[in-house]
């Protein structure tokens, strides 16, 4: 029964993550396909460059909600009794981590857009908000400061997700936070960093687009 529930959590969370809010908002608001502009991604950064701040903020918020909703759904499926310590508690944490990662995977490889979406940053933070708000807030602040000081959204995104992981290390080792939270941060930050590999190459070559540059 537990395996069936975990499978349900993964499938539903992946579908939630696959909802392409960047594509939907751009198509409805400006009758354009966001994938034909800029990076070709459906995330908030490309929406910002193409449609402006209001649309980008809406998309980022909706993408965050996807991640948080997936983690919340895992809690509902496993059951409230799993909040107790022991085997059920471990099952809940495992399910929540799976849900968050499945949502991130859905955002990156959405089934509705031939498996080409965004880079998963906002959805990752949505899952982190539901799992460990303090790490999400810290990582979000690092992201904003990093992007603001450097002018590069990609650099801010990478430092933000790594920052969330960096905070979870002492929280786990010293304060006794669940190891599963750190596992989520490790896998999520690694995946997002890999998805930014082209940006990293451009950063090193001095050719990365600035945050305020319009998409072409």
UniProtKB/Swiss-Prot annotation:
Q: Where in the cell is it found?
A: Cell membrane
Which chemical reaction does it catalyze? Answer: an acyl phosphate + sn-glycerol 3-phosphate = a 1-acyl-sn-glycero-3-phosphate + phosphate
Which keywords appear in this protein's UniProt record, sorted alphabetically? Cell membrane, Lipid biosynthesis, Lipid metabolism, Membrane, Phospholipid biosynthesis, Phospholipid metabolism, Transferase, Transmembrane, Transmembrane helix
Q: Identify the pathway.
A: Lipid metabolism; phospholipid metabolism
- Give the enzyme's EC designation: 2.3.1.275
CC annotations in GO: plasma membrane
Q: Which SMART domains match?
A: G3P_acyltransf
List membrane-spanning regions. Answer: 6-26, 58-78, 92-112, 125-145, 158-178
One Pfam family recorded for the sequence: G3P_acyltransf
Presence of keyword Lipid metabolism:
yes
Superkingdom to which the source organism belongs:
Bacteria
How does the protein associate with the membrane? Answer: Multi-pass membrane protein
Gene Ontology MF: a single term: acyl-phosphate glycerol-3-phosphate acyltransferase activity
Q: Which NCBIfam families match?
A: glycerol-3-phosphate 1-O-acyltransferase PlsY
What's the subunit arrangement here?
Probably interacts with PlsX.
PANTHER family attached here? GLYCEROL-3-PHOSPHATE ACYLTRANSFERASE-RELATED, INNER MEMBRANE PROTEIN YGIH
Q: What does this protein do?
A: Catalyzes the transfer of an acyl group from acyl-phosphate (acyl-PO(4)) to glycerol-3-phosphate (G3P) to form lysophosphatidic acid (LPA). This enzyme utilizes acyl-phosphate as fatty acyl donor, but not acyl-CoA or acyl-ACP.
* Family statement drawn from the similarity comment of this UniProt entry: Belongs to the PlsY family.
Protein name, please?
Answer: Glycerol-3-phosphate acyltransferase 3
Name the source organism: Dehalococcoides mccartyi (strain CBDB1)
Gene name as annotated: plsY3
